Amino acid sequence: MQFLDDDPLIAKKDFGVQAALDAYFEELSGVLAALPREKIAAAVKICDETRRKNRTVYLCGNGGSAAAATHFAADLSKVAYVPGCARFRTCVLSDNTSTLTAYSNDESYDRAFRGQMEGLATRSDLLIGISTSGISASVVEAFAFA
């Protein structure tokens, strides 16, 4: 099997990888420096209060944001575990395709997450919505209920 870097024309070609990495890390450093640390700390406290009360963290998003919600839920329930403490209880509203498509088909996609919240969520549960635009109707509707 031949790999691309075995090709002498490709091996000699400078694709500007180092310059691209340098620019990426410089941009990333700026983004990290600009993060609102106080707001992040407040969000972590809210998540921890939800865990301590043995309440559920619901998450939702569309497209890549749905994948991010699933990944975050896995991190909360597995990685954020502290021995001797309760684990996070998580539910990703975009993961159950049967329920998601039933609400989408029978009502509207805009109500797909809200409909699930109406049947599942209780007082003191937490909803985390992920949206790159910030205006995804299905995510906004879930927050209107929460």
Describe the role of every protein-language-model region:
Residues 40, 64-65:
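N-terminal, charged amphipathic alpha-helical interaction modules
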Residues 1-34:
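Generic N-terminal amphipathic, Lys/Arg-enriched alpha-helix
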Residues 35-53:
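A short, well-structured juxtamembrane/interface segment
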Residues 9-14, 55-62:
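Glycine-rich phosphate/diphosphate-binding loops and the adjacent beta-loop-alpha structural elements
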